[in-house]
Amino acid sequence: MATDTPPQLAGPPTPAMETLDRDVVMSPRKRRRLSASAEPELTEPESDGTSGGRGAAAEAPETAALEPKSLFNSTSTESSITSSSTTTTTTSSSSSIAPFLAKHIRDQHASRNRFAPADSSLPRRKADSKYCYRHRPDLKCRRQADEPTVDQMQRDLSTLSQNDQQSIAHFWSLFSAAPSKHRNLMLQGIVAQCCFPQLSFLSASVRDLIRIDFVTALPPEISFKILSYLDTASLCNAAQVSRNWRHLADDDVVWHRMCEQHIDRKCEKCGWGLPMLDRKRLKDTKRQVQLRAAGKEAVTGRQQQQHRPWKAVYMDRFKVGTNWKYGRCTTTIFRGHTNGVMCLQFDDNILATGSYDATIKIWDIETGKEIRTLRGHESTIRCLQFDDTKLISGSLDRTIKVWSWRSGECISTYTGHQGGVLCLHFDSTTLASGSKDNTIKIWNFQDKSTQILRGHTDWVNAVKLDTASRTVFSASDDLTVRIWDLDTGKCIHTYAGHVGQVQQVLPLPREFEFKHTSHCDDDRSDRLSGSESPDHRASHDSNHAPDLPTTSAPPTQPMSPLFEALFNEDRPAPPRYMLTAALDSTLRLWEVHTGRCLRTFFGHIEGVWGLAADTLRLVSGAQDHMTKVWDPRTGTCERTFTGHRGPVTCVSLSDSRMATGSEDCEVRMYSFKA
């Protein structure tokens, strides 16, 4: 009795195998034509008398059992490959599959190859030398399938016959062992033979699988860099993805950058700007943020609790900025003066006001109650300024007084002006004052010296010191604004353009940014040129008021050569931009170093008396009883506040508050805090 020979693992391909190879890439129509013309003949393997072929075939299904939890696991793949290669039922499948598996298993898993011993003399390549991060075997290529998917596949597989189970297991083993190029070719062949429902199934299955969690895969520094490009809404959405994403999206490194982009400036991307809360904290924690971005611990836990998270800072500033934008605020009215309020200033929880009734009142902002009244001047209080220790006031009685506002004591009195004192401004070492006598007086706190700046031909209504550049700005009833050198006492430049008495001048913070256009918005005739009319050219030391045209403003003078000569690397230049307000009902934005009027703000119907500004907005108060909030970059009026029953004579501004004083004897405080 003849016995069947065991299947051979190597040999020439049979007609059946050739037909199967053609069928992989053959269209269904061509396959039907070929099968009708030539039916392949299956030959029974020869017997060598050692074992029965049918018995080996019968054992194959039992030895090809699929391990459900390791369908795509490299270890289970190798065991499946070994089992499959030894239990193949036909010579054709054995002769084609086994060499393929042996070759590619040796290439990809040389250290655990069961087909041939590893050659220790060959240099081992790095695991990621041939693969991108998506296909690196040590990362993603041999990823474990999720439990529900594997269980469902096992249940579906168990419903098939043993031969079908073995065939599918062989196909999985073949695909698992194939390199990237072969896998792509196999997938192309499969996709080419799929019908539309099968393609739809593929699309739905792959949609979620191709998503990569880059936050987990990348180093924290790179993840921080990517997240820092998101806007606020996107960052909040990212924090909802997972715990790991939330941990990174809420980190101080990301929100510190967000605060830098928006707080105290306008973001170029979204157009939002948020008010500055505390500049000191930004400097103190800069080093800590850099260390955290580098993956290092910046501070101890106890120290870290002393600082608010930057996300909380942003949230607070965002709420305040939104309140400014939509005009949501609470109003507190301070009543106590018996005559019109002419000047005011507030800081933290203290408000100081000066009035026609010759008194200065100190108020508690939170309670709205008067703390004390400073008495000593004999006439109207036109100007005041205070810091932590002292308050300085100027009056129409021609004197300047220094007070201890906490105790109410008058420390000293300065005299020297020949007319009423209309304005003052001081820093740590210097006091500047302007008067009805058309002069500016500079008082030195340290050496008690004084200096007089002459050049204006009418009352000096406003002065502002710039400590860094050692300059002072002044505005006058002679329709001009001047900038002076404190070291020499000379006028550096005169700015002309208003057709009404200039009441206020305000240098903007150096952080203020303005997008320039090719020409001035309004006074195109005021642009600097080398050929000004001699009729409108005035000397810096002229003692006569310029001739005023009836239909247009006098042109600005060319920039003085002194400007470029004075300010260089050793001496900082003055702020680049300044604002002015005048009784011609307009405000103007100027470029200081060129003398150009960049923008004119129209909206008030009577003269403007009060002016305050920061990097985000400016506030003006006018004879028309109205207070307006403007965007300095666009020139648009964002909001108008009414309520005063008299002209608004003075205004003051902070990040979350605005105060206005009026001739109706009232002070109104608007709070935009969240």
UniProtKB/Swiss-Prot annotation:
Annotated WD repeats reside at 336-375, 377-415, 416-453, 455-496, 557-600, 603-640, 643-674
User: What spans are recorded as compositionally biased (Basic and acidic residues)?
Assistant: 518-544
User: In this protein, which residues make up the domain named F-box?
Assistant: 212-258
Q: Which domain of life does this protein belong to? A: Eukaryota
Where is the sequence biased in composition, kind Low complexity? 56-96
| GO biological process terms on file | protein ubiquitination
Q: Does the keyword Magnesium apply?
A: no
Q: Where is this region: Disordered?
A: 1-96, 518-561
Q: Which residues form a coiled coil?
A: none
Q: Does the keyword Transcription apply?
A: yes
Record's keyword terms, sorted: Repeat, Transcription, Transcription regulation, Ubl conjugation pathway, WD repeat
One Pfam family name is WD40
Subunit composition and interactions: Component of the SCF(sconB) E3 ubiquitin ligase complex.
* Name recorded for this polypeptide: Probable E3 ubiquitin ligase complex SCF subunit sconB
Origin organism of this chain?
Answer: Arthroderma otae (strain ATCC MYA-4605 / CBS 113480) (Microsporum canis)
Q: What is the lineage of its organism?
A: Eukaryota, Fungi, Dikarya, Ascomycota, Pezizomycotina
